[in-house]
Amino acid sequence: PVVTIAADDSKEISYIDVFYTQHGQMDGKMDDSTNTKSRFWRHAPVGTHKGKWTASLPLFSMKKPLWVYANVRYKLDQPISGAGYYYGSYTAHSFNLSSIMKVASVKQLQAAKTLVSLKPTNLVEDFQGNWQKEWYSYKPEKWGIKTHKVYDEQWTAPEGAKISFEVRTAQANLLTVGIDDHASEVQLHGKEHWQAIELSPTDFRDAEDKPLANWKGIKQFRLDDTERLRPPRGSKAKAKLVGAPWKGKPPEFRNLRWKKG
């Protein structure tokens, strides 16, 4: 599918982003809050065609609906300061206008003879180009990042696989790798050398020190310096702090993938 964006250009446009998902719920049932919170929104680069802004939307499935919206970013004439998530102060130099979300049902996709072009892959993230568009953080002053890519069927873990990636840091540090309610600590050597990391489900522990059984149904993947794991409701366990304060420059990552055993 191709989406066309009609944006107000009476004010200079800094850039346009298009996000889309096939995790939208259209079955008429009560909202699946877990799915709603875990949806993975793909980013689609925007270009111009015959004087209009357009974006191609490669799909993985014809059995799920398509939800899509656009963000249009404009520069502010003067900076504006305020308070954001968790009362953190900020100064904005631009503002964002989001479109109304457009929805295409499975029947509409099939009637339009939409083609599926995405295939399963073990490479979850190459950390190239605009990769940050598909990751997020509630604390932009820190380097820690999260993604729901692992919730998408395109990146389903093969049976018996490990999650692997490479990381490079200037100083020795303790890296926290998180999956849902579990996390693992990884000792980094530093010295600006690429270090290969491989982790099994049992390397991830929750606040009760219980290991992750397998990769099935995982929803969120995180990389950070520290995080606090919360025990489930009714548990006698206490919150568990994982990791340590970061030293030096933010780390670099490459080749996040599932590695078959």
Where does each model-flagged region fall?
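Short, aromatic- and glycine-rich surface loops/edge beta-strands on solvent-exposed regions
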Residues: 63-77, 219-223
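Short, surface-exposed loop/turn segments at beta-strand-coil junctions that are enriched for proline
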Residues: 58-63, 204-208
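Surface beta-strand/loop "capping" patches
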Residues: 1-20, 30, 39-51, 56-58, ...
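Extracellular ligand-binding interfaces
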Residues: 123, 135-217, 222-240, 246-260
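Beta-strand-rich binding/interaction modules
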Residues: 12-22, 27, 66-70, 176-177
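Short beta-strand elements
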Residues: 77-121, 247, 254-255
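Extended, solvent-exposed segments with strong compositional bias
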Residues: 30, 36-48, 188-201
